[in-house]
């Protein structure tokens, strides 16, 4: 929805890791294109039913223009947003570019530290970086969709992957 809020007038800075920016550049263009195709299909159907047409939430031009607002940051380096707010990104090890975002907010002589994290990766992964410790915080906002799940040992996961590759390549000739 970043291009959508841009299309509605947002012109603020968007802070993210370099990998997140690179992924966004591709994905936002792609979603704008897919959305345009879906809207064309939907509108043809609505025309036949003599019902109102719809417009895409945003287009490829919005997706391209919003990229000018992106500011990349390095992991583990504090960045001052303004006099009262500092932000730091810490590698969460979940996927390329993922981060725990820590805010330090000073207001009326008080300092509060707030951290937000989505998914957190596994320790000692062979594919992704190990999650790094983030600065202490007063408040933690944590996405926890799969928080009650235990993951298989990495060796078990590798054996499962090997089994799928073996079955696909050797037995199904894929």
Task: Describe the function of each predicted region.
Residues 1, 5-171:
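His/Asp/Glu-rich metal-coordinating catalytic cores
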């Amino acid at each position: 929805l970043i291009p959508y809020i841009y299309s509605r007038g947002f012109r603020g800075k968007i802070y993210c890791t370099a990998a997140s920016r690179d992924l966004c550049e591709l994905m936002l263009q792609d979603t704008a294109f897919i959305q345009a195709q879906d809207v064309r299909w939907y509108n043809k159907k609505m025309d036949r039913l003599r019902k109102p047409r719809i417009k895409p939430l945003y287009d490829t031009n919005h997706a391209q223009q919003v990229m000018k607002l992106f500011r990349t940051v390095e992991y583990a380096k504090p960045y001052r947003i303004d006099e009262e707010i500092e932000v730091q990104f810490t590698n969460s090890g979940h996927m390329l570019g993922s981060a725990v975002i820590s805010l330090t907010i000073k207001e009326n002589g008080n300092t509060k530290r707030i951290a937000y994290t989505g998914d957190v990766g596994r320790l000692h992964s062979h594919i992704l970086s190990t999650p790094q410790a983030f600065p202490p915080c007063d408040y933690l906002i944590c996405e926890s969709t799969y928080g009650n799940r235990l993951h298989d040992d990495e060796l078990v996961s590798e054996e499962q992957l090997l089994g799928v590759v073996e079955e696909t390549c050797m037995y199904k000739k894929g």
